[in-house]
């Protein structure tokens, strides 16, 4: 299991939101490229970038920052989400050196777009499913749909999706532990690898994820915990490596 540091981009800065609310953000750095360097030097093997402005506007806003990070670390797998709603945007990021693009809102509203993207960019597409009480949320979490997460995840199995990033909105940015039972259930219900996201606070939460013994969980995204110092990236990754030998 990989520990994946999150860099959330808002107005060119690195921030964290509480429960997806743009008005409730904390700025952690005005230099996201330097922040990426910090996590790389700390031993991370993958980075999770989110264009928050892009998620709300439906098109890339902080793309220049994403490109700068991808070009600085050409051998580091980078995944980007937020505002990815066209094949042109995916092509732009892939050409810039980004390893994976995360399709969120568009995947819920137009599931056929995921299949189209997977055909055009095989191995490059991740689906981001954000949920509240098991139901998918869209548009920067502003809307909660009547679609169940597990049902939608199964629909993407035949498309060739590389992974699903599952975020429990109620947990995100609250550092109260992630929704392990549902994350494990999702991993068991689909053949697509799952990346857990939202609510990780400390090493105990990583241990709890490992204790779930769900082989389909391949990563855990962490944000506020590593910025506020309650979780150390290198220590958490070492724990995962030891447990999964």
UniProtKB/Swiss-Prot annotation:
Entry keyword set: Amino-acid biosynthesis, Cytoplasm, Histidine biosynthesis, Isomerase
Primary location group: cytoplasm
Catalytic activity entry: 1-(5-phospho-beta-D-ribosyl)-5-[(5-phospho-beta-D-ribosylamino)methylideneamino]imidazole-4-carboxamide = 5-[(5-phospho-1-deoxy-D-ribulos-1-ylimino)methylamino]-1-(5-phospho-beta-D-ribosyl)imidazole-4-carboxamide
One Gene Ontology MF term: 1-(5-phosphoribosyl)-5-[(5-phosphoribosylamino)methylideneamino]imidazole-4-carboxamide isomerase activity
Keyword Isomerase: yes
Gene: hisA
Pathway: Amino-acid biosynthesis; L-histidine biosynthesis; L-histidine from 5-phospho-alpha-D-ribose 1-diphosphate: step 4/9
Catalytic site positions: 8 (proton acceptor), 130 (proton donor)
Family indicated by similarity: Belongs to the HisA/HisF family.
Name the record gives this protein: 1-(5-phosphoribosyl)-5-[(5-phosphoribosylamino)methylideneamino] imidazole-4-carboxamide isomerase
InterPro entries to which the protein is assigned, alphabetical: Aldolase_TIM (IPR013785), His_biosynth (IPR006062), HisA_bact_arch (IPR006063), Isoase_HisA-like (IPR044524), Isoase_HisA-like_bact (IPR023016), RibuloseP-bd_barrel (IPR011060)
One CC-aspect GO term: cytoplasm
One Pfam family it belongs to: His_biosynth
Keyword Cytoplasm in record: yes
Organism this protein belongs to: Pseudomonas syringae pv. syringae (strain B728a)
Protein's cellular compartments: Cytoplasm
Example of a GO biological process term: L-histidine biosynthetic process
EC numbers: 5.3.1.16
Organism domain of life: Bacteria
NCBIfam families tied to this protein: 1-(5-phosphoribosyl)-5-[(5-phosphoribosylamino)methylideneamino]imidazole-4-carboxamide isomerase
């Amino acid at each position: 299991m990989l520990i994946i540091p999150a860099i959330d981009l808002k107005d060119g800065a690195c921030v964290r939101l509480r429960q997806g609310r743009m008005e409730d953000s904390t700025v952690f750095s005005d230099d996201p490229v330097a922040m990426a360097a910090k996590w790389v030097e700390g031993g991370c093997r993958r980075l999770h970038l989110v264009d928050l402005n892009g998620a709300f506007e439906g098109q890339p806003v902080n793309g220049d920052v994403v490109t700068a990070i991808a070009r600085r670390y050409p051998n580091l797998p980078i995944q980007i989400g937020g505002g990815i709603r066209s094949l042109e945007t995916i092509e732009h990021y892939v050409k810039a050196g980004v390893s994976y693009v995360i399709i969120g809102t568009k995947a819920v509203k137009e599931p056929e777009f995921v299949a189209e993207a997977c055909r055009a960019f095989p191995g490059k597409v991740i689906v981001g499913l954000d949920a509240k009480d098991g139901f998918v949320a869209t548009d920067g979490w502003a809307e909660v749909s009547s679609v169940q997460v597990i049902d939608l995840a199964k629909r993407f199995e035949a498309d060739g999706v590389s992974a699903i990033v599952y975020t429990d909105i109620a947990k995100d940015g609250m550092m109260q532990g992630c929704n392990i039972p549902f994350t494990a259930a999702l991993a068991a219900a689909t053949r697509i690898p799952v990346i857990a996201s939202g609510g990780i606070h400390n090493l105990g939460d990583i241990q709890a994820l490992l204790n779930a013994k769900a082989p389909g969980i391949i990563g855990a995204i962490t944000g506020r915990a590593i910025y506020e110092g309650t979780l150390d990236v290198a220590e958490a990754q070492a724990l995962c490596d030891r447990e999964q030998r």
